[in-house]
Amino acid sequence: NKKLIKKKYFENMNDDNNLFLTNWFNGFVYDSDKFWFEVDDFDESAGDIKGVWELSRWYWVVRIAADSSLTHNKKLLLLHDKTSEWMRQNPYLLGPNWKCGQEVSLRVIHFIFSLRLLGLGPAHLDGSQVEFIKIHLDRILPTLSYARGQKNNHWISEIAALFIGGVWLRNHHISRKKPYIEIAVKQLRLALKKLFNDDGSFAQSSFNYLRHALTLISIIKLESEVEGVDIK
């Protein structure tokens, strides 16, 4: 399914009408005028919601940033254009792509990681990029307790997004008002105790979820070292 979705996406790279609102499993197009909590989880006509979430996880921005066939300026232009197009189709808190905190987290992590691959850092953020990161973190915060209650990979994903995003925003006079980093570090310490057993195994009996959690923790550590943020 992922191969099919990727193929369909890149074939429609320049066809932006409802690109990020389309369920690529069945072609269903979601409305973007409903708050995320009004989107029906069990609408049979919509099908599996992961079909619309897939593109909005933004793994493809990393692919753009790493594409050796594109110039640096072309990559920046593509990233800017696709970010603007995504926001046009997905106004803040409206539509299916704001529904899940983990999906929101993966999107902003991939966005920031793509900037890293392009040789950019927090000091290079423009106003639209700052706002893009901020609204994602602000969506995660109110439902973080829900992710914590699940005691699974969702919790780690949202912690990682808050930490990494908070690090990138800290010199833009935003995270002083909302202590994203402090919240993330506190939650990370708790999650490490709750989600990992003494033998190193994970709370979920899945190597994939264990790998996912360890990857995110590694990214948190790397980001803390690069930007000089103490997480001990």
Q: Where is each model-derived feature located?
A:
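Aromatic-lined, polymer-binding surfaces characteristic
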Residues: 32-34, 39-42, 46-232
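Extreme N-terminal leader/anchor segments
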Residues: 1-19, 23
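Low-complexity, compositionally biased segments
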Residues: 4, 15, 26, 34-36, ...
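Terminal targeting/low-complexity segments that flank the catalytic cores of oxidoreductases
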Residues: 16-28, 33, 44-45
